[in-house]
Amino acid sequence: MYIPESIGTPLTPNATKVMLLGSGELGKEVAIAFQRLGLEVHAVDRYEHAPAHQVAHFSYVIDMTDAAQVRELVERVRPDFVIPEIEALATDELVKIEEEGLATIVPTARAAKLTMNREGIRKLAAEELGLPTSNYEFCSTFEEFSAAAEKLGYPNVVKPVMSSSGKGQSVLRSSDDLQAAWDYAMSGARVANSRVIVEAFVEFDYEITLLTVRSIDPTTSKPATWFCEPIGHRQEDGDYVESWQPMEMTPRALENARSVAARITNALGGRGVFGVELFVSGDDVYFSEVSPRPHDTGLVTLATQRFSEFELHAKAILGLPVDVTLISPGASAVIYGGIESEGVSYTGLAEALAVAETDLRIFAKPEAFTKRRMGVAVSTAEDVAAARDRATLAAAAIKVHPGNSAEA
């Protein structure tokens, strides 16, 4: 993977350029991290005024699943690095772009292609690497889906193979749920006529995200892996609501988690941050999913670590030394839109920031939806429990109002 010998000046012919494919709240923080290191940032999304658009040097609106549009933009900009920040991309074209040497795909084009859907990454994890996972079946039709659910037993979980943030995901408790779950999975998929994965229910004690960083070890000049402290999180309908770090684990469970994370990220290759999602039952660890990019539950690292997951991602991509030191226990709590409106306004910032050791990130998305993440509160404290209370209190103080209805 390419390592620049120097960093050029933005907006000049010798600029070192990064192109973000996906410009949401995570991409916004990545863009800021790269700008702090002196790189020229090009942010791409499917709609105007996305969060990262607002902080990048250049912004573009294209259909990122359209191979021709992706290629035209890469050939026009000629970025040094193309950094996927979402799954729904023309990954076959990224493979060609990488093979032709037009740009370095982060972490690799193969990783982007494998992780764009649950089928590719699950087969790599379970069938090629032999990692422990739940029992599962992939299905293309309702008939296959119904048979798989009966085979795996109830309760089980169904997800589209291509979706994000819990869209289309549901728990089946009996055969009475089959039709509704199938219809919901089809509506939540990113592509029409999507396949689904049906997973046997895993009885787990808790779930974690283990942020795994691949960069160059400055002492050996060779690729190496670092692990952030484990992040616990709570989900509702498949979407994260709050996260905290560190998540208390037994030494054996942590060792097993790091082993699973190292094996899957080594198989994907390249450099950067990987969000490895794991189920933990006692000392046993089960692989769930992996994202070859910063993870939404990792927003907590804005408060807890010396360098956030976004700063670590930027440094690792460039092959620079990384520092995963935890400086304080902390937590994050999501601020949802709660309404359907464009050009919303926010109140309650003073009340939220009056909570001790607390900060906010308002994502500045141009349109709010009831369950759309519009911001996050991050807090630190002497322990995780106190930090969770603080973050939840601060997030609840923020109110989202339609249009310009809020008073200044």
Curated annotation (Swiss-Prot):
N(1)-(5-phospho-beta-D-ribosyl)glycinamide binds at E25, L26, E85, D296, K365, R372, R373. Pfam families: ATP-grasp, PurT_C, RS_preATP-grasp-like. Its EC number is 6.3.1.21. The keyword Metal-binding applies. It catalyses: N(1)-(5-phospho-beta-D-ribosyl)glycinamide + formate + ATP = N(2)-formyl-N(1)-(5-phospho-beta-D-ribosyl)glycinamide + ADP + phosphate + H(+). Keywords: ATP-binding, Ligase, Magnesium, Metal-binding, Nucleotide-binding, Purine biosynthesis. Pathway: Purine metabolism; IMP biosynthesis via de novo pathway; N(2)-formyl-N(1)-(5-phospho-D-ribosyl)glycinamide from N(1)-(5-phospho-D-ribosyl)glycinamide (formate route): step 1/1. One of its GO terms (molecular function) is phosphoribosylglycinamide formyltransferase 2 activity. Residues 123-318 form the ATP-grasp domain. ATP binds at R118, K159, S164, S165, G166, K167, G168, Q169, E199, A200, F201, V202, E207. One of its GO terms (biological process) is 'de novo' IMP biosynthetic process. One of its GO terms (cellular component) is cytosol. The keyword Plastid does not apply. Mg(2+) binds at E277, E289. PROSITE patterns: ATP_GRASP (PS50975). Belongs to the PurK/PurT family. Homodimer. This is Formate-dependent phosphoribosylglycinamide formyltransferase.
